[in-house]
Amino acid sequence: MSFQNSLSLSLVNPTHALCMVGMEITLDISKCAPDKCKSFTIRGSPRILIHISSSVIAGKEDTVVWRSMNHPTVALVRMVAPSPTVDEDKVLVSYFCPDQEVPTATAVLFLTGIEISLEADIYRDGQLDMPSDKQAKKKWMWGMNGWGAILLVNCSPNAVGQPDEQSFQEGPREIQNLSQMNVTVEGPTSILQNYQLILHTSEEEAKKTRVYWSQRGSSAYELVVGPNKPVYLLPTFENRRKEAFYVEATEFPSPSFSGLISLSLSLVEKAHDECIPEIPLYKDTVMFRVAPYIFMPSTQMPLEVYLCRELQLQGFVDSVTKLSEKSKVQVVKVYEDPNRQSKWLQDEMAFCYTQAPHKTVSLILDTPRVSKLEDFPMKYTLTPGSGYLIRQTEDHRVASLDSIGNLMVSPPVKAQGKDYPLGRVLIGGSFYPSSEGRDMNKGLREFVYAQQVQAPVELFSDWLMTGHMDQFMCFVPTNDKNNDQKDFRLLLASPSACFELFEQKQKEGYGNVTLFEDIGAEQLLSNGRESKTISQILADKSFREQNTYVEKCISLNRTLLKTELGLEDKDIILIPQLFCLEQLTNVPSNQQSTKLFARPYFPDMLQIIVLGKNLGIPKPFGPKINGTCCLEEKVCGLLEPLGLKCTFIDDFDCYLANIGDVCASAIINRVPFAFKWWKMTP
């Protein structure tokens, strides 16, 4: 018995055939008809659907169709369900001569229906469904009404530094994190002894996925499809109807990888002669998309704060620890990595997450500037179940912008008629090519673009010494949605707002009050600062010109942000902040540039630790008037009416010394978005 696409009937012996559920067989009615017969009837078992001319026969044993035989006639026969036993279903064709009520002859076709399929979570509801339209499995569609299965990348910290081709044997606990895929065989499997089931993908796709299977009687999971193993011959299923396989991806979408991976199950007929090739009969395919990694904005609720455990930063660490306790957020201390340059924690790392319907995984994206690291201490401090992803960079200079720390994420926004439910990634750079311009390298930038779900916006940040946008902007959450306002505010640094504040204090008679009153002379000198009065600052024309330049740079970004994020002026709060222009500091002489870059003149109040409504703001050490810092007072007056609570972190060296700033000292893991990425349309 074999699978056939077309059959001829016989009046001598019954015809026997295997039929794949859903596939059509062309049945020649005329070829075996007796010469004098002019008409025929056709009927089939309930599991058989018959198309003939404009009629459809289905569902009832006694349904019969009469047809004339004036011209050659064919019928299309299709099984709609698998047969319980061999030859269980049949088609009867009876031939009649003119004026005869009794058939002259009858031909019988015995069919055995077999159903072979790959099942996955096509509808993203946690269920392994058999779609009514099998062709739908071969496509992957975005959107609320979309479909298509999803794979997670294996980002286990234990796999960091291991070759992608290594064969892993997953334990039962870990295997549940993978996407399940079932191979189902329905029907009398005993007749499949001369056939072979093959699970396969392309050689290129095999490099990007791993499929595991635990055979009966074994507790280990065998790697059956993966790197260098694109094909797996399944053993005979015997009486088993369903086998569960577990699938993972080995890499995220990238410029050279769309994120789509197809897995197929094929049925082939074995040849009795070794010289004769096997014959492919049927193939079922499921299309998967690899889940992207998603960054969280500062407006998402915090889960954990990771702090660099350096003695020089102890004041900062203690302050942030207290703030975290106040916010009921766990604090994790990270030891300094001796193999890295001093600015490494948030400068080279970022928390994100990846998600499938059955699992959400928090992970660290690490972009080390030091090549060929032998170990990654950060992975040992992560919460169990977290992932660790390394993406190598190209520009290893100290002042390079080629790291993941050179980006931010906006809250969800709507701009120019399009929704961005997961926000937009903001990437800082030079804005145009130049010999001294600094940018994120093309490979890393396109890697971010390839995730598709947080459409990037490129901003101008090369004017800053660190190049980090968090020195002039920050997003904070609010509950104020009245008057069509958003549930967040964008804070922007504003030198002009600071000068206006100082001018106001000068008019009030406080022109002789100094900045950095509580900072010792040696500490100021080591940080390149000196104690100045309000009047001295206002009278310094060169300093004014430097901040005019900074204001123009920020204004350019403000215009871009309003357009690309759909912001209005009422969504933006100006924070008084001054800058000064200096040459790059703490870099080797061969990396020095004649270009001047902006650096915060006093600790940057935009570099905020956002823990829900609690804000950890760098203490600016501004002019004290009646015992109160006028800069702190101004910022509190702007933010506290929105329900935010301001705590000023007292650690001058942390923010201005060469060891780095708060950007390099802490990273925050946050609650993932409630919105599911597959429901959006990029």
From Swiss-Prot:
Disulfide bridge positions per record: none
Entry keywords, A to Z: Cytoplasm, Cytoplasmic vesicle, Nucleus, Phosphoprotein
Annotated Gene Ontology cellular component terms: cortical granule; cytoplasm; cytoplasmic lattice; intermediate filament cytoskeleton; nucleus; ooplasm
Description of the deletion phenotype: Female mice exhibit dispersal of the cytoskeletal sheets in oocytes that lead to a failure of zygotes to progress beyond the 2-cell stage and infertility. Oocytes are depleted of many proteins required for early development, such as ribosomal proteins and proteins that control epigenetic reprogramming of the preimplantation embryo. Male fertility is not affected: knockout animals are viable and present at the expected Mendelian ratio and do not exhibit any overt abnormalities.
Protein modification: Phosphorylation at Ser-2, possibly by RSK-type kinases, and Ser-434 creates binding sites for 14-3-3 proteins.
Residues where Phosphoserine is found: S2, S434
Superkingdom: Eukaryota
Protein known as: Inactive protein-arginine deiminase type-6
Origin species: Mus musculus
GN (gene name): Padi6
